[in-house]
């Protein structure tokens, strides 16, 4: 689903019918928004104001908060953080290799976004004041919907009706646009955040697998329990980031391959 839906919607004269069909086939709930990056205009929306689990897509916002602290002079990407074995959680492919020497803040952000390293995310989350601190950052930049209440890996539980660690497609798209185009971050930090998304190494089975030659993509995926799956992406033809696409899926019995 997540691989084919954006391009199918883009090409379809009836994009909402395409989304409804996908939702029916998966027997779950799909939330999607396609937004013009330059203007912020909504191009396509389906369940865009309904809550969905963020899963690992929150890591982009987290690193945006870290970069805001860097811009303010309160953090440095070169600062080394040391941690212990007991700080590691499931799926930490990068951080587990650096117990002896630690990792810099910049390296942790790269690991969190490009490899979805969960321990890296938790270590970064601690630097911004935990889940409550990240939620406060979101409120400061005008996102009154998105909320983080838990750490990795509990935040991926995706319980029905649970508002914890959720967002809406519309809110996530608007927040991404603010981080990447407004003055919330310096131009240098915007370029860095976008580059980490360009360098994503765990999104191969999704949109990247069907993208036409010459298209730009920068993305971050997420996976959770109870059929939850998600992706946030910037993409466009002629190797230019023209639009933001956010897709979330929940409450489906579909396999991971089918969700992808």
Curated annotation (Swiss-Prot):
SHV enzymes hydrolyze broad spectrum cephalosporins notably cefotaxime and ceftazidime. Residues 1-11 form the signal peptide. This is Beta-lactamase SHV-6. InterPro entries: Beta-lactam/transpept-like, Beta-lactam_cat, Beta-lactam_class-A, Beta-lactam_class-A_AS. GO terms for molecular function: beta-lactamase activity. Keywords: Antibiotic resistance, Disulfide bond, Hydrolase, Signal. Disulfide bonds join 63-109. It catalyses: a beta-lactam + H2O = a substituted beta-amino acid. NCBIfam families: bla_class_A (NF033103), SHV_LEN_OKP (NF012143). The gene is bla. GO terms for biological process: beta-lactam antibiotic catabolic process; response to antibiotic. Its EC number is 3.5.2.6. The active site is at 56 (acyl-ester intermediate), 154 (proton acceptor). Belongs to the class-A beta-lactamase family. It holds the Pfam family Beta-lactamase2.
